[in-house]
Design a protein with these regions (language model features):
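Hydrophobic/aromatic-enriched cytosolic interaction surfaces used to assemble or bind macromolecules
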Residues: 1-280
């Protein structure tokens, strides 16, 4: 869990608090698993509140990437954009109108009429809204995990001199590892490996799947990184370039020395979610 505040400029984001709490129940009935999530979130909020960190603001939570469908539509000249977005949501999700939740926004691409549509099962959103409410959080935004991670790593890049040119981002998650090559406003997915094939990562790195980059940012839970039988240092050795583990400890809108907080890379998803919250 990450709590951020924003003062003025986009870059002036302050980390008010960070907290981790194990869920403690990975299997079992769905109701029991979500009850465990609610207890863990409430415990994290309680500790942050005891440290005088306000947690009663609006919240953002994530969906797994495979729980959300997205599409880009060119609707230039059409006046029925909301209806067209809903129809697209039904089409790409295959869900009934009363069982989905969707949103759309202007894409900001080359064509002025392009919109981006995101859709997910309504039940998944309702679960998260309920869990957040039990912890006293008003959930107002749902985002995708990989989108949140990419947002966090691109924000971190502004504090690294080696990231002024092309750089890469690696995210280790339960499903495996994802990699992007980033240059300017462009972020291109270049690597997707399943967690069931850990031996494929060293080979992909040696083949320069990330391309020529000045540095690589790494995010993800230490358990997920260890599953690939590697480490941040080993990734740097294979690539022969600087590797930066995500660490937002102490960020106050200004570059600062990395604190080397244990588990720092695991906060990338939470930070990216909170970043969207303060920006919106």
């Amino acid at each position: 869990m990450a709590v951020l505040s924003r003062r003025g400029r986009d870059a002036d984001v302050r980390v008010e608090g960070l907290e981790r709490e194990p869920v403690g129940l990975a299997g079992g009935p769905e109701d029991a698993r979500w009850a465990a999530v609610a207890r863990s979130l409430a415990a994290a909020v309680s500790r942050l509140s005891a440290a005088e960190v306000r947690c009663d603001a609006c919240g953002v939570m994530a969906l797994h990437d495979d729980e959300m469908r997205t599409a880009t539509l060119d609707l230039a000249g059409r006046g029925d954009i909301p209806d067209a977005a809903r129809q697209a949501a039904e089409r790409i999700s295959g869900l009934a109108p009363d069982s989905l939740a969707f949103d759309w926004r202007h894409y900001g691409g080359v064509r002025s009429g392009e919109i981006a549509v995101a859709v997910a099962p309504l039940a998944l959103l309702e679960r998260r809204i309920d869990v957040a409410a039990q912890a006293g959080i008003d959930l107002t935004v749902i985002d995708g995990e990989s989108a949140a991670v990419l947002r966090a790593l691109r924000y971190a890049a502004q504090f690294e001199l080696d990231a002024q040119g092309a750089y890469a981002a690696l995210w280790f998650c339960d499903a495996g590892v994802c990699g992007w090559r980033i240059e300017g406003s462009s972020a291109i997915p270049v690597l997707t490996l399943s967690g069931t094939l850990p031996e494929a990562l060293p080979d992909a790195l040696r083949r320069r799947a990330l391309g020529a980059v000045h540095c690589v940012f790494v995010a993800g839970d230490e358990r997920c990184i260890a599953r690939f039988d590697t480490s941040v240092a080993e990734i740097g050795d294979v690539l022969g370039t600087a590797v930066v583990p995500f660490d937002c400890t102490g960020w106050d809108g200004q570059p600062c020395a990395r604190a080397g907080m244990p588990g720092g890379p695991a906060f990338a998803v939470a930070f990216g979610l909170a970043l969207r919250g303060v920006w919106e």
